[in-house]
Amino acid sequence: MTADISLRPADHPAVKSGKVGVLLVNLGTPDGTDYTSMRRYLREFLTDRRVIEWSRWKWYPILFGIVLNRRPQKVGRAYELIWNKEKNESFLRTYTRNQSELMAERLKDLDNVKVDWAMRYGTPSIASRIEALKQEGCDRIVLFPLYPQYAAATTATVNDKAFHKLLSMRWQPALRTVPDYHDDETYIDALAQSVEKHLSSLDWKPDMLIASFHGIPMSYFKQGDPYYCQCQKTGRLLRERLGLTQENFMVTFQSRFGPEEWLQPYTDKTVEKLARDGVKRIAVINPGFVSDCLETLEEIAEQAAHSFHENGGEKFAHIPCLNDSEDGMKVLEKVVRRELQGWV
């Protein structure tokens, strides 16, 4: 709904309003692979209480005394392996920007909708893009955390950051948060089609298809986080859609950090065990990642593949994320159009 300009007094200042914003938000990325950029990014990420729930007195001495002195260099080297050299940025940034631009094109039938993108950690920040959308006249914003499965450490922290920005705004836009879509039919179909397309390009058939999701500490799950259950359901629906059995499909969890027990089975240990048990050919897909990033391109496509081959495996395939593909954009567009109902 657009305000009737004719009703404004003659001396009324120019004010843009009546538009609806769509803000796509992913996890984040460092600005570069150098030590300073990596440390700045890791500090913002690892001081988030949604990510690390330890008490500050316990966690900060470890973080500032050890982690932020050692890990920036190590993680920076990993990023260098998968850095988008052409654009001098991470592929996560490239894909998220592309998704935003493609979404704007797909929604061009809606005159009053503006699409933008942000990162929870790093740049562009959520706060800066909410401010920009408001300045463009968006008095309503659909906040879309790009996570098919809900977790407090991902979706909730995006919502936290957005609402924290509203605390500083005199004229707040209405904010609508997008729920998870872990069992959405279009999403499951897109994953299945991606698997079928990629495997059809190989001259071999995998003995096992692994759906590897980012892990979270087991304690988070026990406190009520629905993430594990949603990952399992996504995996089951994908397996059924592909017509596979539990003997040739499994769900695993990757990227654990620190000494705590995380969701299991662990992807790295599973890949190693499968190879040692005589499984020769496997394929891995990452259904929980909307875009390829460090955890998929380096941790799975490089590290997991190397481990599999080192322990006796012969053939390893990593199935790309949906990224900015046509099928991937259909999923995102469906979710956005659903959440725009009543506003456009």
Curated annotation (Swiss-Prot):
Pfam families in UniProt: Ferrochelatase (PF00762)
Keyword field contains Secreted: no
Chain positions recorded as Fe cation binding sites: H214, E295
Record's catalysed reaction(s): heme b + 2 H(+) = protoporphyrin IX + Fe(2+)
Enzyme Commission number(s) of this protein: 4.98.1.1
TM segment ranges: none
Family matches, as InterPro entries: Ferrochelatase, Ferrochelatase_AS, Ferrochelatase_C, Ferrochelatase_N
EC supergroup of this enzyme: lyase
Its job: Catalyzes the ferrous insertion into protoporphyrin IX.
Name used for this protein in its record: Ferrochelatase
Gene coding for it: hemH
